[in-house]
């Protein structure tokens, strides 16, 4: 018999918090065993992985669908124990005629739970999923910064993780791409918000809604503020959450686009995965999710090695030549590490200088130009040549982000803007 595993924190200084904890504890034990297991599993995971902490200000991204509504209710049940300050953010892409009703539904949930709500409406229709995702994350990030939330949580599940693994595998992603849905990652600015008036950008639905006071607040990006994206439900399946909705009688807003099989991810969900379960492995979801978790932990380890080696191999040399940046890399050190680490080092370096995610092709171009030498190039490196002569034999590599990387004598990298 489990003893109260959920409410492991106590607050003897505040009788009000203690009362809330006791009340919440009783309500939990009145729920069905399956519900308690999910709460217990999530609570233990938060402790083990240390992805959320007591007394944090947490901003929950809520669409109104099953996964985000379950996440909201779970965190709401745990908030008195962890002493969290919760906030809800909802973004309306105006993809459907009833999207305003969906936003109102979320606002009523926030009012009933007495949680601050931040709602945003796009000013232009964006039909591209990637652009819409970038707009959504950028806006949520600004809300978090302006209202002092340290983390953003989303309702991605183990099922989403498996579908993303298959999707990225089909697209030919590397190991990092295969485990792209991670427990925690830093949310960087994507600069995708088109600035409009506050009235156009934000729609208010209830007294619990807060919004930006002026345009400058939305434009302002506080320096040295790290916002992290947390996905606490990656070990909970979509089916488990479906049972939770039924047991708790939660009101959710179904997304009809999830049934559209013209979308690749939906074909994976509704056609490919059921086929794999029936004809290959009935627990294929669990197997693939376990593989993803193994890749995630191994990637963290390899990335830490790659960044350490890069910090030892990299130095900047200022150059007066057209405001270009000259970078000196210790190519001998890079050649001494395994190929997998070489590629990770160059991938991380190129991502930083281009402010985007470079492809395997670009990584290999730079690696071959910098690290693969011949006898003639070795002899050439020993020759005494001035810098002007070396510029004549440079190799230019065109990168994303309108950057050109010039490799000089396999010793220097010159980074400049592509003005064409």
Swiss-Prot record:
Cellular compartment(s): Plastid, Chloroplast
Any one GO MF annotation of this record: tRNA(Ile)-lysidine synthase activity
GO terms classed as biological process: tRNA modification
N-terminal signal peptide: none
Record-linked PANTHER family: TRNA(ILE)-LYSIDINE SYNTHASE-RELATED
Binding positions (ATP): 63-68
EC number: 6.3.4.19
Family per similarity comment: Belongs to the tRNA(Ile)-lysidine synthase family.
Sorted UniProt keywords: ATP-binding, Chloroplast, Ligase, Nucleotide-binding, Plastid, tRNA processing
Pfam families (alphabetical): ATP_bind_3 (PF01171)
Keyword field contains Plastid: yes
Organism domain of life: Eukaryota
Catalytic function, reaction form: cytidine(34) in tRNA(Ile2) + L-lysine + ATP = lysidine(34) in tRNA(Ile2) + AMP + diphosphate + H(+)
Keyword Plastid among record annotations: yes
Domain free text: The N-terminal region contains the highly conserved SGGXDS motif, predicted to be a P-loop motif involved in ATP binding.
UniProt source species: Zygnema circumcarinatum
Enzyme class: ligase
Entry GO CC: chloroplast
Name of the protein in its database record: tRNA(Ile)-lysidine synthase, chloroplastic
InterPro entries registered for this protein in UniProt: Rossmann-like_a/b/a_fold, TilS/TtcA_N, tRNA_Ile_lys_synt, tRNA_Ile_lys_synt_N
Chain's role: Ligates lysine onto the cytidine present at position 34 of the AUA codon-specific tRNA(Ile) that contains the anticodon CAU, in an ATP-dependent manner. Cytidine is converted to lysidine, thus changing the amino acid specificity of the tRNA from methionine to isoleucine.
Cysteine-cysteine disulfides: none
């Amino acid at each position: 018999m489990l003893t109260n595993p959920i409410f492991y924190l106590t607050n003897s200084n505040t009788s009000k918090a203690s009362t809330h904890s006791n009340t919440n504890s009783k309500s939990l034990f009145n729920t069905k065993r399956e519900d308690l297991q999910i709460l217990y599993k999530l609570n233990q995971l938060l402790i083990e992985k240390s992805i959320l902490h007591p007394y944090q200000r947490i901003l929950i991204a809520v669409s109104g669908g099953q996964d985000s509504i379950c996440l909201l209710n779970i965190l709401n049940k745990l908030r008195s124990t962890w002493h969290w300050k919760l906030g809800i953010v909802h973004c309306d892409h105006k993809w459907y005629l009833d999207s305003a009703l969906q936003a109102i539904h979320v606002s009523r949930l926030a009012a009933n739970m007495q949680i601050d709500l931040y709602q945003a409406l796009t000013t232009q229709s964006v039909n591209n999923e990637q652009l819409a995702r970038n707009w959504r994350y950028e806006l949520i990030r600004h809300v978090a910064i302006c209202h002092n939330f340290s983390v953003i949580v989303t309702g991605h599940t183990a099922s989403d993780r498996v579908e993303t693994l298959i999707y990225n595998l089909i697209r030919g992603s590397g190991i990092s791409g295969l485990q792209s849905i991670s427990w925690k990652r830093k949310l960087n600015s994507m600069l995708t918000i088109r600035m409009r008036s506050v009235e156009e950008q934000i729609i208010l639905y209830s007294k619990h809604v807060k919004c930006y006071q002026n345009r400058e607040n939305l434009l302002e990006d506080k320096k040295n503020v790290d916002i992290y994206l947390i996905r606490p439900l990656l070990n909970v399946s979509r089916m488990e959450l479906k049972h939770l909705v039924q047991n708790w009688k939660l009101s959710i807003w179904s997304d009809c686009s999830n049934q559209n099989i013209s979308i690749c991810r939906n074909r994976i969900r509704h056609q490919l995965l059921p086929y794999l379960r029936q004809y290959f492995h009935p627990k294929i979801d669990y197997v693939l999710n376990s593989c993803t978790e193994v890749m995630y932990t191994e990637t963290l380890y390899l990335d830490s090695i790659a960044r350490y080696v890069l910090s030892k191999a990299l130095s900047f040399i200022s150059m007066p030549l057209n405001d270009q940046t000259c970078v000196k890399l210790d190519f001998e050190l890079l050649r001494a590490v395994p190929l997998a680490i070489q590629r990770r080092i160059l991938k991380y370096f190129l991502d930083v200088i281009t402010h985007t995610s470079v492809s395997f092709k670009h990584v290999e171009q730079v690696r071959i130009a910098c690290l693969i030498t011949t006898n003639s190039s070795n002899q050439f490196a020993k020759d005494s040549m001035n810098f002007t002569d070396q510029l004549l034999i440079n190799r230019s590599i065109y990168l994303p982000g309108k950057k050109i990387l010039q490799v000089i004598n396999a010793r220097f990298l010159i980074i400049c803007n592509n003005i064409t």
